[in-house]
Design a protein with these regions (language model features):
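Conserved phosphate/anionic-ligand binding catalytic regions in large, soluble enzymes, centered on
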Residues: 5-9, 54-63, 221, 228-240, ...
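Glycine-rich phosphate-binding loops that contact phosphosugars or nucleotide phosphates
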Residues: 44-191, 271-315, 333
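Active-site phosphate/pyrophosphate-binding segments
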Residues: 15-49, 129, 139-267, 339-358
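Extended hydrophobic-aromatic, low-complexity segments
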Residues: 59-60, 76-77, 106-109, 208-209, ...
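Generic C-terminus detector
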Residues: 2, 317-358
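Short, conserved micro-motifs enriched in small and acidic residues
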Residues: 54-58, 154-161, 225, 229, ...
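Intein/HINT protein-splicing elements and their conserved insertion hotspots or analogous self-processing inserts
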Residues: 1-17, 21-22
Length: 358
């Protein structure tokens, strides 16, 4: 049932504060005890792989990024469809982490089987109890997103982000990593349900911004560092539900080719939520404005936004977690572009909820 919402996708976007709270309750109470990992031999781990497809791959890129900030180990993130055929040196000293909403993604399952053949420790993050991924892995952590009916993932993705953040904190502890303040990080994560709720209250504003894209064939997303990972997911969502061609670029790469695509009235969606690189990103964005682009800017509360007409701000959160509220805004944008165009947002053409074929 849609519960009074127009679509399942909209309903599931609005369920995010609750399911994030449930996921956090399941995994960060009792000081990140995570008894599901009690048999993990951290002393053997000398490299970590995150392996996934699609939206789950974007969540895995996020996990790779934050774990690298805390742990001095080689940490990789590989698309499952590539992992199977690449020359990756997997052995008994490897931890392979597989992320899949359904737990039935064919390429991810094949990658898991390959890892087990090479004696790696395996851990899955999935939303479905008893799924193939869960049954075949040595260890499993569940997101608490509940059933997700819409093909385009929303609540499953944000619960993956928060669970992977919890997992990375736990792995940092197990692998002698350095976290500036674990208690602060946990407190910040506990604020995410309220932060996401605040973003959902910006729905009308994102619906207005969506009108900029209704007649566009192309859109360009840019960001740096974690913002780049967020725009990868934002571009995918826009493609999935509205059929607008969307590319995501590292902001610093604009001048190496993509800026040739920018002309009058081109729509650029830009993220600048990372304090260490925000000003450089703003400089890159202004280059697109100078060429006539219309820019939708998602940024932090204190960022100077002079020169931009379409601005939305996220609350003050730790920069490592800013992608969570930013992602919700990008979901809303994609949703309302699709609605304006009359697309079937719950069942986009040519897509399946669970990709069980290679």
């Amino acid at each position: 049932q849609k519960g009074g919402y127009d679509t399942f996708m909209q309903k599931e976007m609005h369920e995010q504060p609750y399911v994030i709270k449930e996921t956090l309750r399941a995994h960060i109470e009792n000081d990140l005890a995570m008894p599901e990992l009690s048999g993990l031999d951290a002393s053997k781990i000398n490299q970590i792989y995150f392996v996934a497809c699609g939206t789950a791959y974007h969540a895995s890129l996020y996990a790779q990024y934050i774990l690298r900030t805390w742990v001095d180990l080689p940490i990789y993130c590989i698309s499952a469809s590539e992992f199977r055929y690449g020359n990756y040196r997997i052995d008994e000293n490897t931890l392979c982490i597989f992320v899949s909403q359904s737990g039935e993604t064919a390429d991810t399952l094949a990658a898991l089987k390959l890892s087990k053949e090479n004696k790696a420790q395996t851990l899955s993050v999935t939303n479905v109890l008893g799924s193939s991924l869960a049954r075949l892995s040595d260890f499993v952590l569940y997101t608490c997103a509940g059933p997700e009916i819409a093909v385009a993932s929303t609540k499953a993705y944000t619960t993956q982000l928060v669970l992977l953040a919890c997992l990375c904190l736990k792995l940092a502890s197990l692998c002698n990593g350095v976290v500036e303040s674990q208690n602060h990080m946990i407190d910040q994560l506990k604020q995410m349900p309220e932060v996401v709720e605040e973003m959902l209250q910006q729905e009308d504003k994102m619906a207005e911004f969506a009108k900029l894209l209704t007649d566009q064939k192309d859109a360009y997303f840019i960001g740096r560092q974690l913002d780049y990972l967020s725009v990868l997911e934002g571009a995918l969502k826009l493609k999935e539900v509205s059929y607008v061609h969307a590319d995501a670029y590292m902001a610093g790469e604009l001048k190496h080719g993509p800026i040739a695509l920018i002309e009058k009235d081109t729509v650029v969606i830009a993220l600048a939520t990372q304090p260490s690189v925000a000003q450089k990103t703003i400089s890159n964005i202004l280059e697109t404005v100078a060429r006539g682009a219309k820019v939708i800017l998602i940024t932090s509360k204190n960022q100077n936004t002079e020169g931009f007409d379409y601005v939305i701000r996220i609350p003050d959160v730790n920069p490592l977690f800013s992608c969570i509220p930013a992602t919700v805004l990008l979901q809303e944008l994609a949703y309302y572009v699709a609605k304006e165009k009359g697309c079937d947002v719950d069942k986009p053409r040519n897509l399946a909820k669970s990709v069980t074929v290679e």
